Amino acid sequence: MAAQTLPASGAAVTFNTQRTRAYLLKLPLFTRATVLIIVLTWVLTLVGKSWNWDVKTWGALIPDEIGIATLYRINTFPFIHLNIFHTILNIVAFTPLLERFEHEHGTLTSVALFFGPFATIPGLIYVFVERFILHANTPVMGASMWVFLLLGMEAIRTYKTNPYFTISTYNIPTWITPLLLVVVTAALLPSSSFLGHLAGLLVGYGFGLGYLKFLAPPEWALRFIEGKLNLLGRLPHYVSVDQKTFGRFGVLPSSASSAEAGIPFSGVSGGQRLGP
């Protein structure tokens, strides 16, 4: 009996499944942990209803609710999402960007930044503008603020090696691409937070240009902690300071092809607000 060959479509599905599985198995530690926290937080939003605990109201970034006792919201709102659709879209958008960042800068640096200035600075910018300029109180949640922050950093790095792209006879600066995506996202998803995305993007530009890199922990301190705790030996998928693939925040630009890698994912971020 003649051997049967797998149809081309079936082979493509198998190949894509294998590539996806291989990619997921190579995700670094902090990226895995962040995705897991997002998923578990979504589960909590469902389970919490039976406990009379509204996770969204508890952890969303609500400008008028920010005070000394509720500063935790600055760190919780990126992990909380409006619904399963919102959760999946932000995971798909955020994972490749975060994975790239962690491989470039290390796990410990990623933890320090995403639980530090990458959350607090755009969050406080949003709260300040909402409360004192717009006199509004629109709650926001979701990881899309981080998506645009990382896209801003990628855009600046791309600009250093490829300053323009051409449409017809016009030269468009490459750094403007995420800004256009913020506008497009706001137009296609009216419930998304234009201000939240813009705050994240501005912080990403600041880090990409090097103005905010002083907020990153010094490498000598990271090496001291890694050595004392033997993090590389104890934690699987950990990326040490000496394993990172690039320099610190734009000091060593990547190639044009790699710098463009994060951009295609931006259109699916869809950060959303609580309520209408």
UniProtKB/Swiss-Prot annotation:
GO MF term (any one): serine-type endopeptidase activity
Subcellular localization, as worded in the UniProt entry: Golgi apparatus membrane; Golgi apparatus, cis-Golgi network membrane
Ranges annotated as spanning the membrane: 27-47, 77-97, 109-129, 132-152, 175-195, 198-218
Broad EC category: hydrolase
Membrane topology category: Multi-pass membrane protein
Keyword Iron: no
Active-site positions on this chain: S144, H197
Keyword terms of this UniProt record: Golgi apparatus, Hydrolase, Membrane, Protease, Serine protease, Transmembrane, Transmembrane helix
Gene3D superfamilies tied to this protein: Rhomboid-like (1.20.1540.10)
Coiled coil: none
BP GO terms, sorted: proteolysis
Catalytic activity: Cleaves type-1 transmembrane domains using a catalytic dyad composed of serine and histidine that are contributed by different transmembrane domains
A Gene Ontology term for the protein's cellular component: Golgi membrane
Enzyme Commission number(s): 3.4.21.105
InterPro entries, alphabetized: Peptidase_S54_rhomboid_dom, Rhomboid-like_sf
Family: Belongs to the peptidase S54 family.
Function: Probable rhomboid-type serine protease that catalyzes intramembrane proteolysis.
Protein name: Rhomboid-type serine protease 2
